Regions:
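Short loop segments at secondary-structure junctions
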Residues: 36-38, 216-220, 248, 307-311
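Conserved PLP-enzyme active-site core in the AAT-like
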Residues: 2-5, 15, 73-274, 279
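N-terminal "arm"/small-domain region of PLP-dependent enzymes with the aminotransferase-like
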Residues: 2-55, 61-64
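Short, well-ordered beta-strand elements within core beta-sheets of diverse protein domains
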Residues: 244-253, 300-308, 363-367
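C-terminal core of ALDH-fold dehydrogenases
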Residues: 10-27, 311-351
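Conserved small-domain helix->loop->beta segment predominantly found in fold-type I
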Residues: 263-327, 347-353, 379
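Conserved N-terminal alpha-helix of the aminotransferase class I/II PLP-enzyme fold
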Residues: 36-85, 89-90, 106-113
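PLP-dependent enzyme catalytic core of the Aspartate aminotransferase-like
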Residues: 121, 135, 139, 254, ...
Length: 384
């Protein structure tokens, strides 16, 4: 079970970080549900002392996702927001961050309502336009925080171009890769310094775990994140780590189906007379379709569309039978949501409208069900 250096993506997902249990030979990493570890003698231990600091199940997951994202080290946290919070401790009071303007509502809440109190400054820019990134950078800018595709309007950032601009100004780049998943894109390949995920989503893939991860490439970032993970203690528990490890093994085959179903459903919606506009990078009508073709392997499992009015959106959301009305994304089941009142409710209405999150916008996290069943469900909801 030795993983070769040139192993391909699916093989890495299954085997990276995985070692048969030395005492039993169990092929699957055990759930080490313990808070502490017995030492052989004073100062003599097997590499584990206290579970906040180290846990073998968590360590296996961290190695697995670091390899999947082509980073040097990974750090697993209790949620995606805990992972983002850890990354932000790389900054100090007075530092400035340029952020994708259409970022996740929870990220906006953390930055605006928590971190501003500690002296960090944020500028929200349309990072789909490289000139906007250049204009937003100041002498005290330390970080470029990107989300691509964005949630929920699926706007893309040219990662190669953005990283070149940032590094020219000695600014490091953080990419939230939750929406795409590493199957679709690996930001480190394009120059990113740090990648964050909510493992709750595609990495876990089964809607039964909440967690987050940071993948780093720079030694100074790795050293600091290891310290902060232990100091703050917002760690991922062993059961959740095991669930995500189970999920990453099937990530490639799940993402193939997510991508295929989303493409088919987007094309169906685009042809429906009661749908004014569909947002999906795989459609040639998407303004950044060519960038998506260059930067992404597939176009992801998320679709957004305009229903025409809040009432029409409500009719569709309440009318589906197979799809579940719920927040989150990336599970095997299809979820449908209303960003303006759900995932982005914490974003002020004027800002939501500015970035395209209108009251008629509906988001679908496309699952891996039979595509004809998904079309049938949407059809009966749209025809109401």
């Amino acid at each position: 079970m030795k993983l070769r250096e040139n192993a391909r993506f699916s093989t890495i997902c299954i085997h990276a970080g995985q070692v048969p249990d030395p005492s039993t030979g169990a092929i699957i990493t055990p759930i080490y549900q313990t808070s502490t570890y017995v030492q052989d003698a004073l100062g003599v231990h097997k590499g584990y002392e206290y579970a906040r600091t180290q846990n073998p199940t968590r360590s296996a997951l961290e190695a697995n996702i670091a390899a999947i994202e082509r980073g040097k080290a990974g750090f697993a946290f209790a949620s995606g927001m805990a992972a983002e919070g850890a990354v932000m401790t790389l900054l100090k009071s007075g530092d400035h961050v340029v952020v994708t303007d259409n970022t996740y509502g929870g990220t906006y809440r953390l930055f605006e309502h928590v971190l501003r109190k500690y002296g960090l400054d944020f500028t929200y820019a349309d990072t789909s336009r490289l000139d906007e990134i250049e204009r937003a950078i100041r002498p005290n800018t330390k970080m470029l925080f990107l989300e691509t595709p964005t949630n929920p309007v699926l706007r893309l950032t040219d990662l190669t171009g953005a990283c070149e601009i940032a590094h020219r100004h000695d600014v490091y780049v953080v990419v939230d890769n939750t929406f795409a998943s590493p199957f679709v894109q690996r930001p480190i390949d394009f120059g990113a310094d740090l990648v964050v995920h909510s493992t709750t989503k595609f990495l876990n893939g089964h809607s039964d775990s909440v967690g987050g991860v940071v993948v780093a490439v720079r030694d100074d970032h790795i050293e600091w994140l290891r310290f902060v993970q232990n100091a703050e203690g917002a760690i991922l528990g062993p059961m959740d780590a095991w669930l995500v490890l189970r999920g990453t093994k099937t990530l490639p085959i799940r993402m193939e189906r997510h991508n295929a179903n989303a493409m088919a459903l987007a094309e169906y919606l685009a042809s429906h007379p009661r749908v004014p506009r569909v947002l999906y990078p795989g459609l040639t009508s998407h303004p950044q379709h060519e960038l998506a073709r260059r930067q992404m392997c597939g176009f992801g499992g998320l679709i957004s569309f305009h229903a025409g009015s809040l009432e029409r959106a409500r009719t569709v959301l309440n009318g589906v039978r197979l799809m579940a009305l719920a927040e989150s994304l990336g599970g095997v089941e299809t979820l449908i949501s209303h960003p303006a009142t759900m995932t982005h409710a914490s974003v002020p209405i004027e800002r939501r409208e500015q970035i395209g999150i209108t009251d008629d916008l509906v988001r679908i996290s496309v699952g891996i069900e039979d595509i004809d069943d998904l079309k049938d469900d949407l059809s009966q909801a749209l025809d109401r």
